[in-house]
């Protein structure tokens, strides 16, 4: 039995043909689709494709997903596995933390962690200099490796989106005087930098798990 897939669009366009950009077996058989797919596969990619609007890094971590989630959902874990965020202290606002990003010459960074235990998602909402608009959002999903790789552990998927504010500081009055850099200056390095940090996370979580230590250390409890 054929389902009425895309019937509403056909009615709206007044034609049974596909809309622009749609590639499905009904209208693009394999001999047509294969060259399209091959064109999408390159040994060398343009710079703006690699460092465009999205930056994603992934890795396998030999650590139970629930224990890794508990660790990542505590904002203070960033003190351990990030390259440059240090000195997390609570603010007067609930769940909002203040730290310093040493990439920006002791720049203040504000962070609120938003998480969902059922979905195993942990999102860090951050901003340099000011706490009122946390526009830098680090999206992390933990996947049970038993489901996707058929082995114990976790798969971590981490994505950042290129918010327009990376290109210019929307709140220049809150910046420290004479600061030579803006966080967006590092966008082209996000992929490598975040992979470095993900390797840090992997090393820390696996060491604790392999050696019988709590993945979330006692100082965070």
Where are these regions (language model features)?
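Glycine-rich portal/gate segments that line the openings of hydrophobic small-molecule binding cavities
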Residues: 79-83, 89-137, 149-151, 156, ...
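Beta-strand/loop substructures that line and gate deep hydrophobic ligand-binding cavities in soluble
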Residues: 6, 127-196, 203
């Amino acid at each position: 039995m054929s389902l009425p897939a895309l019937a509403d669009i056909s009615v709206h366009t007044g034609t049974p043909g596909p809309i622009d950009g749609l590639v499905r077996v009904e209208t693009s058989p394999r001999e047509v689709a294969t060259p399209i797919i091959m064109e999408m596969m390159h040994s060398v990619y343009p710079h703006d494709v690699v460092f465009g609007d999205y930056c994603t890094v992934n890795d396998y971590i030999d650590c139970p997903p629930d224990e890794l989630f508990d660790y990542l959902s505590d904002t203070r874990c960033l003190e351990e596995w990030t390259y440059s965020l240090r000195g997390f202290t609570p603010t007067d606002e609930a769940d909002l933390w203040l730290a310093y990003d040493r990439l920006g010459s002791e720049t203040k960074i504000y962070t609120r962690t938003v998480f969902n235990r059922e979905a195993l998602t942990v999102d860090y909402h951050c901003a340099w200099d000011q706490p009122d608009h946390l526009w830098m959002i680090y999206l992390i999903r933990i996947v049970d490796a038993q489901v996707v790789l058929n082995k114990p552990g976790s798969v971590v998927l981490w994505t950042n989106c290129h918010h327009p504010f990376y290109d210019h500081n929307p709140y220049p009055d809150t910046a420290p005087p004479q600061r030579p850099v803006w966080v967006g200056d590092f966008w082209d390095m996000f992929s490598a930098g975040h992979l470095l940090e993900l390797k840090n996370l992997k090393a820390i979580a696996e060491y604790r798990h392999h050696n019988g230590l709590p993945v979330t250390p006692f100082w965070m409890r």
